[in-house]
């Protein structure tokens, strides 16, 4: 998820530093973009192959100030030859299933923006805005088929939006910044402005928002051998809580994953499973088996169906 950024939704480097367009492959799937602009949106991609599939674009108050960005998926341009590519190299793009959201009040008040969003939702290629004139026009950059990549679980764009807001991020628990940003994306709003002239949700310093949060630690669970795995988990899963070496040993039935990897995975396995559920195309996901999986004790915050509510589920 990218939110509240003036540009780069995203900026794709292409093969300009390698000169090998055949080696540049990007799979952009199931991302959420909110409130980009007004400097720019997604652009560049000088050489390479790109899939833009089932992404969810939600233009916000900052996007609304530049109409040309409201319905942009990407603006490809040719390489200028100043690095490793030959001058004139374009990327190739496959776009399908991407959805633009028109519910932000700043967007709904602009008839042109509403019309353009309808246009790109009808035909995603209306969201590819060429920056320059390739030899054969849009055909130069257009691929009729997706480029082959590794198999992953995919949702449609609308479901991806809900999944990202509910489950995305590398945090075991979301902090107040994560919660604020996902809430703003859901409601099409913003909370802060910059201290140096930026407006509409764009900031100029971390001091303009919550700053750097001081995180508090909790007492750690008993770990007699100091291997990073609590005694209770080791005992429940056939390990020796007084043997420091078993944490780095392969865990039974885990395809080579070590015991400590299986333990760490167990902390967020329920989040991962919920995030991957209801996929329209699913790859085989491997979750290492445990003899006695722990009962989650954390607070999981997820979206309720009503757009302005949070549903907080406590597990014990």
Listing of model-derived features with the role each one plays in the protein:
Residues 90, 99, 104, 109-216, ...:
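Extracellular/surface-exposed low-complexity segments
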Residues 206-298, 304-306:
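Extracellular calcium-associated, cysteine-rich motifs in secreted modular proteins
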């Amino acid at each position: 998820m990218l939110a509240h950024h003036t540009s780069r939704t995203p900026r794709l480097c292409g093969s300009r530093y390698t000169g090998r367009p055949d080696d540049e492959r990007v799979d952009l799937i199931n991302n959420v973009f909110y409130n980009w602009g007004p400097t720019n949106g997604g652009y560049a991609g000088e050489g390479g192959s790109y899939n833009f599939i089932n992404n969810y674009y939600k233009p916000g108050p900052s996007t609304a100030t530049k109409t040309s960005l409201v319905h942009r998926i990407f603006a490809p341009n040719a390489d200028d030859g100043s690095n490793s590519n030959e001058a004139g190299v374009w990327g190739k793009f496959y776009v399908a299933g991407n959805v633009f959201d028109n519910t932000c009040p700043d967007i709904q008040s602009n008839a042109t923006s509403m019309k353009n969003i309808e246009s790109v939702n009808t035909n995603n290629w209306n969201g590819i805005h060429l920056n320059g004139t390739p030899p054969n026009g849009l055909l130069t950059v257009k691929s009729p088929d997706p480029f082959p990549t590794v198999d992953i679980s995919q949702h449609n764009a609308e479901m991806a939006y809900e999944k990202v807001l509910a489950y995305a991020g590398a945090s075991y628990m979301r902090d107040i910044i994560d919660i604020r940003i996902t809430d703003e994306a859901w409601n099409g709003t913003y909370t802060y402005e910059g201290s140096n002239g930026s407006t509409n949700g764009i900031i100029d310093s971390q001091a303009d928002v919550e700053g750097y949060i001081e995180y508090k630690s909790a007492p750690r669970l008993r770990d007699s051998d100091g291997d990073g795995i609590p005694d209770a988990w080791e005992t429940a899963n056939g390990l020796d809580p007084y043997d420091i070496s078993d944490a780095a040993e392969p865990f039974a039935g885990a395809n080579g994953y070590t015991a400590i990897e299986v333990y760490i995975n167990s902390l967020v396995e329920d989040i991962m499973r919920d995030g991957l559920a209801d996929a329209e195309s699913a790859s085989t996901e491997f979750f290492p088996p445990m003899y006695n999986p722990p009962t989650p004790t954390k607070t999981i915050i997820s979206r309720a169906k009503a757009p302005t509510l949070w549903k907080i589920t406590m597990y014990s």
